């Protein structure tokens, strides 16, 4: 049987058209475009995955699409985490957040400085820090000084939607493409009459969560006998602890009665009449109460604080990757 070339061409053309039409993806409608834009804004996931979610659930069911995306992101994150788990995480951020007599300190590590400065990474740090502080609401208070507790990071949940922090981190691994480890999740509890203040340097983060390479927490009690705001006093002391590298709280320096005449040359008689109290400050001092106050070096920290009618109960200082063992969720 002889088939003409024209018939063959017609058959091939029809087959080719059917094949192409089967593989062509329809362009999104106006409502789908808006839904796609909204989905990307809410989740930050790729165009491809958001498109798949909309194809699965439609533009009118964004909540289900978001759930699907988060589940898929965690699954992809665990796969990527398994591949990246051996990579060292030497960069990152330390954060602090305070609420009354409680404070949360978190250290989240990543591979590069580039990712540590990423806004997505900082949002992750903020979510984890809030989760740690939220856990403090269930852990009571201290009866004396500071009580430092390590949170159970495997059961830690976010305060907003109850999502496990380890799943939140795994999701970020898939999104950012780097190994991420939570090496510190600490609670500081103080007595009910103590107010905690926090600070981070260099100062980053948000209005409520301070982030940086160094963090400090100072606990104050007592009412001001001046108009100087307690919040400002606490902030100044936190700055001092970071900058002056205080190691212990210590005790106040003894104030000695001394004759100025004994401390000057015999030719200098101008101060010979003075016989008062002088505090001798050691510039190498590491006890907080005995250190020269950073913003007013003529006074010790103890003198400055008591001058405002307050007292320091305790303090805490730490920095990125100091005295903690890195713990990864990847196995």
UniProtKB/Swiss-Prot annotation:
<dbReference type="GO" id="GO:0003746">
    <property type="term" value="F:translation elongation factor activity"/>
</dbReference>
<comment type="function">
    <text>Associates with the EF-Tu.GDP complex and induces the exchange of GDP to GTP. It remains bound to the aminoacyl-tRNA.EF-Tu.GTP complex up to the GTP hydrolysis stage on the ribosome.</text>
</comment>
<dbReference type="InterPro" id="IPR001816">
    <property type="entry name" value="Transl_elong_EFTs/EF1B"/>
</dbReference>
<feature type="transit peptide" description="Mitochondrion">
    <location>
        <begin position="1"/>
        <end position="14"/>
    </location>
</feature>
<keyword id="KW-0496">Mitochondrion</keyword>
<dbReference type="InterPro" id="IPR009060">
    <property type="entry name" value="UBA-like_sf"/>
</dbReference>
<dbReference type="GO" id="GO:0005739">
    <property type="term" value="C:mitochondrion"/>
</dbReference>
<keyword id="KW-0648">Protein biosynthesis</keyword>
<dbReference type="InterPro" id="IPR018101">
    <property type="entry name" value="Transl_elong_Ts_CS"/>
</dbReference>
<keyword id="KW-0251">Elongation factor</keyword>
<dbReference type="InterPro" id="IPR014039">
    <property type="entry name" value="Transl_elong_EFTs/EF1B_dimer"/>
</dbReference>
<protein>
    <recommendedName>
        <fullName>Elongation factor Ts, mitochondrial</fullName>
    </recommendedName>
</protein>
<dbReference type="GO" id="GO:0070125">
    <property type="term" value="P:mitochondrial translational elongation"/>
</dbReference>
<dbReference type="InterPro" id="IPR036402">
    <property type="entry name" value="EF-Ts_dimer_sf"/>
</dbReference>
<dbReference type="Pfam" id="PF25025">
    <property type="entry name" value="EF-Ts_N"/>
</dbReference>
<comment type="similarity">
    <text>Belongs to the EF-Ts family.</text>
</comment>
<keyword id="KW-0809">Transit peptide</keyword>
<dbReference type="Pfam" id="PF00889">
    <property type="entry name" value="EF_TS"/>
</dbReference>
